[in-house]
């Protein structure tokens, strides 16, 4: 059995070819490229697309211009590939702001391309810039928005349960003082103290999700639904958490 989260050699070659094309077309160098989304989290469906995210740097003369230049590269989304990149200076600014999405990218289990020395130095800075306060708010807000938007009917799109459950477990992880939540859902779930019946329901739903299509609908899951509701209510009163971000700006230069 091959997990849907694996990337076969043909798709990996296609992604790498796309990255080479980006380097030539935009005159940049890709320093890091990974999977975000369901394949990075570890609960992809057979027909999940590939969410490729990358960090890139321009040639020196680009940084000497007076006018600010566009710092994002976005390609048109096709039936399988969703490709988007952030310029390196923008990425450093996001780390300075303790952006949880950016921090997740650096923990992706699926890496297509990497300047190991540069990216290792960047990863080493994460603990100094990570903000429990900002991360917890990011994950809680995401869960609340997705719950209100996708899980209100008696029949729901099954994948959306994970778009509420994962950020809620990440918020709990942060509240428990464990630091940066792991990107992989399996690690996040293993580190969460959930009752056996709830864990069994999540495992069963995960199996369905990995077997069914992205658009699969099913009846509301009462036990899981009740847990999500209770966590969202509990989260309305945020705990006192440090903002941290004790990093040295000189390290980002």
What does each of the following model-derived ranges do?
Residues 37-78:
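Catalytic metal-binding acidic patch
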């Amino acid at each position: 059995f091959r997990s849907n989260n694996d990337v076969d050699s043909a798709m990996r070659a296609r992604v790498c070819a796309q990255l080479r094309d980006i380097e030539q077309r935009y005159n940049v160098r890709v320093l890091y490229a990974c999977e975000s989304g369901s394949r990075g989290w570890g609960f992809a469906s057979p027909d999940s697309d590939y969410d490729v995210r990358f960090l890139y740097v321009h040639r020196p003369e680009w940084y000497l211009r007076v006018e600010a230049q566009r710092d994002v590269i976005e390609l048109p989304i096709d039936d399988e590939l969703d490709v988007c990149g952030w310029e390196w200076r923008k990425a450093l600014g996001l780390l300075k702001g303790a952006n949880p999405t950016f921090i997740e990218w650096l923990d992706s289990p699926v890496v297509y391309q990497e300047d190991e020395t540069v990216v290792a130095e960047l990863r080493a800075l994460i603990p100094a810039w990570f903000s429990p306060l900002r991360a917890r708010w990011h994950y809680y807000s995401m869960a609340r928005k997705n719950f209100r938007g996708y899980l209100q009917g008696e029949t729901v799109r099954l994948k959306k349960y994970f778009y509420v459950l994962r950020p809620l477990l990440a918020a709990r992880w942060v509240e428990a003082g464990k630091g940066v939540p792991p990107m992989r859902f399996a690690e996040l779930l293993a580190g969460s103290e959930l009752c056996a019946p709830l864990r069994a329901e999540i495992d069963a739903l995960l199996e369905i999700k990995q077997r069914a299509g992205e658009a699969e609908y099913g009846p509301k899951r009462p036990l899981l639904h009740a847990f999500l509701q209770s966590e969202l209510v509990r989260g309305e009163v945020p705990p006192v958490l440090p903002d941290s971000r004790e990093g040295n700006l000189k390290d980002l230069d």
